[in-house]
Amino acid sequence: VLQRLSLRTLALVALMTMPSQALDIDFEGNVELELRHFPNPARHQDMEDNFASLAAEIELGFFSPSGRHAVIIKPFARYDQHDHERSHGDLREAKYRYVNGSFEATVGVDKEFWGVTEFLHLVDIINQTDNVESIDGEQKLGQPMVKFSYASRYGTLSAYSLPFFRIRQYADPVTGRPNSGFIVDDNTSHFESGEGRRTDDYALRYQNNFGPFDIGLSWFDGTAREPQLLVPFPPEASGLANGLPMLQAYYAYLTQAGLDVQATLGSWLLKLEATQSTQNRHLPDPRFDNRPSLDMDIAEVQTDRATGGIEYTFYNFFDSGTDLGLVAEYMYDERKQKAPHPFGNDIGIGLRWTANDPQSTAILLGGLIDLDTDSTSISLEAERRLGRSFKAILEARFQDKVGADDDGAQDGFAAALADEDFMRFRLTYYF
């Protein structure tokens, strides 16, 4: 409630201080119909195979004639037929922005993207992932912040104060899909900081370009956006869903240094993201198949991660008027198979075709290969504008192979999604 009142007060004060006699007002938005289909039978009888949902997003902007002042509000909401956790709303943006020459200040709720790579974004840490919107991590929740930026010929320096934390949501424990084999209790979260969602997180970022190189350096100090999922103790403490104990999210204190580099060399793009982070994590519990639990001690873990690769574009491919891009990236985590995510030692390969037609037709085909287990997954995204106001998007994701390492241990991440292939169709109307 306090956050909502503060944002309302901010918006009213900002609007009253802007010159009203020539205020520019922009209003736009979209409404989306989404259909999802899971061709394989669900793990549990209460889970559905077909989902329909409606989503809407609007953007309202107030701009002063000088361009120095702006208030932008962008709410988002979705209603899902079966997944109650996916039926949610979010304030993507609700900010006042002031620009004066090389100086810029932003106060309110905003979204910030850092990074250059295609398959995995390591340095992108400001906003929490909107996990129920899409499993690829591309959708983000709005983050309350105060941001100051200064640009000069020596580069751009930005400082962020992040006073409120957003938890990560998970699919409905009874009906939601895709289901990764574990169920998370969204109602119970644990924070190392002791302050809960009230945080004193901060971040710094420096950006500059040197000839063909675009370079970013970043530092983050605060609550980790990605939680460690723990078995509660006793296991039945959070209750059962579909006969399984529900896991609980633990958000550790995190410090992270990041580097992102992109070199543009004609038709070539060379990309790199690297991070070094330190945080406390609960140790594996042998009573629960070495899954970490709240009953285990905490140890400090320092982790080095990197991802990078190349992208080459064939412009006017075979004189067709279309462009074909080839993407190849490698993803590394020094923990390899012990990493709490599937990107420990993987290669991503992609093809991006754009028709360059009035309908903005584009197709993206991607594949991930785990070099330790030979597990493979495939994704396809195709989009096309229909007339002036509609866009159709088709997406499909398949776990093609579930492999095992040299010791015969099955790839747990691939096995968890083996029966969760899905197709998604979206029809969006823009106004």
Where are these predicted regions, by residue range?
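Transmembrane beta-strand segments that form the barrel wall of outer-membrane beta-barrel proteins
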Residues: 33-41, 70-81, 92, 129, ...
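Extracellular loop and loop/strand-boundary signature of outer-membrane beta-barrel proteins
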Residues: 41-47, 78-82, 130-134, 188-192, ...
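Repeated loop/turn-to-beta-strand initiation elements of outer-membrane beta-barrel proteins
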Residues: 67-71, 102-105, 154-157, 212-215, ...
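Residues that define the transmembrane beta-barrel architecture of outer-membrane proteins
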Residues: 48-56, 87-92, 101, 140-144, ...
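Outer membrane beta-barrel
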Residues: 61-177, 211, 397, 401
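Detector for outer-membrane/organellar transmembrane beta-barrel domains
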Residues: 222, 265-284, 288-369
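Residue-level signature of outer-membrane beta-barrel architecture
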Residues: 23-25, 60-64, 97-100, 109, ...
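Outer-membrane beta-barrel "beta-signal"
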Residues: 148, 310, 415-431
